[in-house]
């Protein structure tokens, strides 16, 4: 698991706790935000395990019912397929839950908290410029109309590109990973498109700034 990927998720969860137009957080407030984000991940792990347990019990009950009560072969097959799908969902949830403790453990590493805090501060300190830049590359839309978590995913990626020197493709890929966890398919495509237009705009600006030969 990449420490910086975890740091980005902590930063996203931390930003979601800040008011829309908050002042940059103090060191103490930043530590509290990161701690709250860590607790959110731990709670998510517990929720995944509880949901997986419930789905396994439900699939077990359905399997027992199919064994005892099916009147014909077709009904048995349909019920068995339903049981298989329930079991697969439970397995997937369990896999996600087993990944999360590693994330929670890594959040205690200094490099993770340091980079996560740095991301939060860059977004907070440069909010106006970041929002203005993102609005410039949106087509017939404005950032304030986008769901809050999607806004913050875009801001984090823009902050990395504009202020931290993260390669544009890396920042875009990491933003899409966050969108896979915290947005829907439409949001993921939107985030990817906005950031690619940002990359194109920055590339054109860089080429225009080069001295002519």
From Swiss-Prot:
The question of whether Glycoprotein is a record keyword is answered with no
One Pfam family from the UniProt entry? NusB
Give disulfide pairs as residue numbers.
Answer: none
Checking SUPFAM superfamilies in the record gives: NusB-like
Query: Which InterPro entries does the protein's record reference?
Result: NusB-like_sf, NusB_fam, NusB_RsmB_TIM44
Q: Which UniProt keywords apply?
A: RNA-binding, Transcription, Transcription antitermination, Transcription regulation
Question: What is one Gene Ontology biological process annotated in the Swiss-Prot or TrEMBL record?
Answer: transcription antitermination
Q: Which domain of life is it from?
A: Bacteria
Of which family is this protein a member?
Belongs to the NusB family.
NCBIfam families reported in the protein's UniProt record: nusB
Task: Summarize the protein's role.
Answer: Involved in transcription antitermination. Required for transcription of ribosomal RNA (rRNA) genes. Binds specifically to the boxA antiterminator sequence of the ribosomal RNA (rrn) operons.
Name of the protein described by the UniProt record: Transcription antitermination protein NusB
